[in-house]
Amino acid sequence: MKILLIGPPGSGKGSVSELLTKNNALKHVSTGNLFRAILKEDSELARKIKEINVSGGKLVPDEITNQVAKSAIDELIKNQQSFILDGYPRTINQALALEQYCDLDYIFYLDINHQELMKRLTGRWMCPKCAGIYNIHFKKPQVDGVCDNDQATLYQRADDHEDAVSIRLDEYDKLTLPLIKHYKTNPRFIKINANQPIKDVYEDINNYLKQNK
């Protein structure tokens, strides 16, 4: 089973993916996580990504993104492992590259309004140890500024600051909205209301998967 979750930053792709992977024996493929892992390396690819200023909200070019994503996806296909794609593809060129070697079974579009996006993104804080995600509006830690799991001090990523969020959403509108139009003609395209709580978004998708196996 090969699933794509598509939607703007803050629509809940990562959180929904985590819930789905726990209950459906799926692997979570997040280009964001892949890039963060690469940035910890001392490699030419890491240096190229750093030069792009990802923390400032800019997207990594298609050529590099396709290379990183294909490496991860090829390995899963080789091992016949079901997976969820989160954050890839984001552009028409990326989608066309993916279609060369991967036939998606489900394409879930997380539809959400701009006001809710800003609330979610600018209120998001993360744990540096376990990568746990909190939000000051609807998913607060038990102790302000402290992770529930390991008591590490939470931090806000640079790309979750208001200025960077605005840049990310502008980039999304420019590059990813055409991608949604591309996928809308696909019979495997399913629109999900992502303005509702993450748990309800997950339930909608999980129920759809159960009913359409």
Swiss-Prot record:
Renumbered residue ranges of the record's region LID: 123-160
- Molecular function terms from GO: adenylate kinase activity; ATP binding; zinc ion binding
Q: Does the keyword Nucleotide-binding apply?
A: yes
Where does it localize?
Answer: Cytoplasm
Chemical reaction(s) catalysed: AMP + ATP = 2 ADP
Q: Which UniProt keywords apply?
A: ATP-binding, Cytoplasm, Kinase, Metal-binding, Nucleotide biosynthesis, Nucleotide-binding, Transferase, Zinc
Which is an annotated Pfam family here? ADK
Q: Where does Zn(2+) bind?
A: 127, 130, 147, 150
Q: Which residues bind ATP?
A: 10-15, 124, 133-134, 196
Which pathway does the record list?
Purine metabolism; AMP biosynthesis via salvage pathway; AMP from ADP: step 1/1
Main location as per UniProt: cytoplasm
Q: What class of enzyme is it?
A: transferase
* Entries under CDD domains matching the protein: ADK
Identify the residues that bind AMP. Answer: 31, 36, 58-60, 87-90, 94, 157, 168
Query: Could you give the domain comment from the record?
Result: Consists of three domains, a large central CORE domain and two small peripheral domains, NMPbind and LID, which undergo movements during catalysis. The LID domain closes over the site of phosphoryl transfer upon ATP binding. Assembling and dissambling the active center during each catalytic cycle provides an effective means to prevent ATP hydrolysis. Some bacteria have evolved a zinc-coordinating structure that stabilizes the LID domain.
Known role: Catalyzes the reversible transfer of the terminal phosphate group between ATP and AMP. Plays an important role in cellular energy homeostasis and in adenine nucleotide metabolism.
**Descriptive protein name:** Adenylate kinase
Lineage here is:
Bacteria, Bacillati, Mycoplasmatota, Mycoplasmoidales, Mycoplasmoidaceae
Q: Which PANTHER family does the UniProt record give?
A: NUCLEOTIDE KINASE
Biological processes, Gene Ontology terms: AMP salvage
Q: Which InterPro entries match?
A: Adenyl_kin_sub, Adenylat/UMP-CMP_kin, Adenylat_kinase_CS, Adenylate_kinase_lid-dom, ADK_active_lid_dom_sf, P-loop_NTPase
Region annotation (NMP) maps to 30-60
Among the entry's GO cellular component annotations, what is one?
cytoplasm
Could you say which protein family the record assigns here? Belongs to the adenylate kinase family.
EC numbers: 2.7.4.3
What do we know about how this protein assembles, alone or with others?
Answer: Monomer.
